[in-house]
């Protein structure tokens, strides 16, 4: 999945929705099959230094929270799976963002609207 599935990535609706769906599927599998001894983990990184982000400038996640290497991501995955952690967050600050979102959804939506306006170059609001 991606942090985009927890926090709604901008500007791509299809990317955000598909990542939300991946997290929902992982939750479902964990709920339905956890008692069968099946462990499910979902990986939710922000920016990772891969060809997918090569050449992109202005990535909000990369600018704010940094880009991690593929090796650091792999290490985080192994550590999370060894610990049987459901939610693997290579960028630990994502948990803070999710907690803020859950605490006051309306405030989070307002903040995301302002953020979207800044990304698109709109002034005001």
Feature roles, as predicted:
Residues 2:
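Residue(s) in the substrate-gating loop at a strand-loop-helix junction
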Residues 7, 28-38:
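Active-site-adjacent segment of SDR/Rossmann-fold oxidoreductases
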Residues 7-14:
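Active-site loop immediately N-terminal to the catalytic Tyr-X3-Lys motif
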Residues 15, 23:
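Catalytic tyrosine of NAD(P)H-dependent dehydrogenase/reductases that use a Tyr as the general acid/base
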Residues 18:
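Active-site helix of classical SDR
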Residues 45-55:
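Short, flexible catalytic-loop segment of classical short-chain dehydrogenase/reductase
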Residues 64-125:
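C-terminal tail/cap regions
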């Amino acid at each position: 999945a991606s942090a985009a599935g927890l926090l709604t990535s901008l500007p791509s609706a299809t990317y955000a929705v598909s990542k939300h769906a991946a997290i929902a599927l992982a939750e479902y599998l964990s709920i339905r099959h956890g008692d069968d001894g099946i462990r499910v983990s979902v990986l939710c990184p922000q920016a990772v230094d891969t060809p997918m982000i090569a050449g992109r400038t202005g990535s909000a996640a990369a600018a704010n929270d940094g880009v991690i290497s593929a090796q650091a991501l792999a290490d985080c995955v192994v550590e999370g799976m060894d610990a049987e952690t459901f939610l693997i967050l290579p960028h630990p600050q994502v948990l803070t963002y999710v907690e803020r979102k859950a605490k006051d959804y309306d405030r989070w939506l307002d903040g995301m609207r302002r953020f979207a306006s800044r990304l698109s170059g709109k002034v005001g609001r």
